Amino acid sequence: MAAPLVTLPLHEALLEARRRGVPHIDASLDLGRTREAVAIGEHRWGGATGTYPYLETCRDRTIYHWTGDRFEPVARYGDALVKLVPTEWGPPTFEIDGIKMLPTAKVSPFEDARTKVGLVEPRGRRVLDTCGGLGYFAAGCLEAGAAGIVSFEKSEDVLWLRTLNPWSPDPDAPEHGGRLQLRQGDVSQEIERLPDAGFNAILHDPPRFGIAGELYSQAFYDQLARVLRKGGRLFHYTGSPNRLTSGRDVPREVSRRLEKAGFQARLALDGVLAQRR
């Protein structure tokens, strides 16, 4: 069992219980996955994994993890600030330099991923997950009965976030039966090493065009067509960029390139759904 993750609502609930002299509260220490009885003391509070000090400062939109002697934000400062961010739904999103990587306005990012996974019908299929992120696409595929998933993630920092996020699937978990392979690497390069027609379905959730233009290129789409079997489905997340401010219609540009690569494509949800011809 992992050490607790603390957010501002949990921190405030702990302090309020201490103020009122309540000996226990029912709370989630893993971002909403489970709930447990939490003991409230004057200087420390405790759950199933031990007792912990109260935070002196707790910021909104921040998740704190236990390092062994103190709580620290789940964030890393390297080439960019990569941060796990709580949501009202439970499953967190993440940000890179303040840019939110997953939709959270209307639905949980986990549920959003589950809906998109359903478009490619992964049951019994071998799935390529090009940009793994927090692993919510992979989790949806595992849940839906995919035969196997190969997932790439370029960022070492994002992979670190996954180790602390209780909603991210663990490739080594016995219940997954070895069906998830998580590989660190740049999929724009690694895809060239994948076999022809090696997958029945593809989920492509790249960073925005301005950050990772190579993942929207004709050359990359040609590679997606090469590794996908005929009749296989691809969902390509594009978001809904403002055409008036960007001067581009990214979803339709993507559709045209996919058609050229050998797909039949149409707009679906906040992206493009395509089938290999």
How does the language model describe each region?
Residues Y216-K230:
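A short glycine-rich, Lys/Arg-flanked "PGG" loop and its adjoining helix->strand segment in the class I
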Residues M1-T87:
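N-terminal auxiliary segments of SAM/dcSAM-dependent transferases
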Residues K154-P195:
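S-adenosyl-L-methionine
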Residues G231-G239:
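Conserved beta-strand signature within the Rossmann-like core of class I S-adenosyl-L-methionine
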Residues G148-E153:
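Conserved SAM-binding motif I beta-strand of class I
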Residues S240-R277:
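Class I S-adenosyl-L-methionine
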Residues R123-L134:
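Conserved class I S-adenosyl-L-methionine
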Residues L134-A146:
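Conserved SAM-binding loop of SAM-dependent methyltransferases across substrates and taxa
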